[in-house]
Amino acid sequence: MKTSLLRRTIIVSLLAVVSLFFLYFLTTGSSAPVHAQPSEKLEMTGNITNQAAAEACLAVLKENLQAASDQDATAYAATLVAAARAETTQELAAFFAEEQLQHTLLSFEVVKQETESMLVAAQQKTISPKDSSYRDHITEAYHTFVKEADGWKIQETVMTNTEFL
């Protein structure tokens, strides 16, 4: 009786290990991840309840990334909430002196949209055109936009899921 129970326990354990092993290889396959390709007309996706507001936030994000690519700290700061502009401009001046990067928006998905705020998940590609220690990558960025007196502005950005190229 004990032998039979021991045999079943070993078989069940082996099946569990084999299943975990199979699941691991199934989820970490060697296929390359698929990334959206940049285009002139980027398609907005997600929970869009106000098309005009979503388009305004998309325009702000494009301006933000273009200003970063152009190393224009003033234009970059203009896309941020008023409270963050002065400090960010000073920090960017030092960063722009060391690195020249090109930023490309690959996708724009509205996660949550309210009258005065919007959460957007965007896929962004950042590359260094010159030989530098900066690592080219694609990242998912969660941008929180808020509506201020002068329009939609970026309040916060959280970067996640960075894949180095």
Feature roles, as predicted:
Residues D70, T74-A75, A94, K130-S132, ...:
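Mature, folded catalytic cores of secreted/periplasmic enzymes
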Residues L5, T115-L165:
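Exposed beta-sheet edge and beta->alpha loop/turn motif
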Residues S19-L23, T28, Q113, Q123-S128:
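Charge-rich, low-complexity terminal tails
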Residues S4, I10-L14, L20-D70, A78:
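Short, low-complexity N-terminal intrinsically disordered segments enriched in polar/charged residues
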Residues A53, V60, T88-T89, I138:
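Amphipathic coiled-coil/heptad-repeat helices and related helical stalk/stem segments
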Residues A59, A73-A121:
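Short solvent-exposed beta->alpha transition segments
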Residues L61-N64, L92, E99, H103, ...:
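Polar/charged side chains located within well-ordered beta-strands of beta-rich proteins
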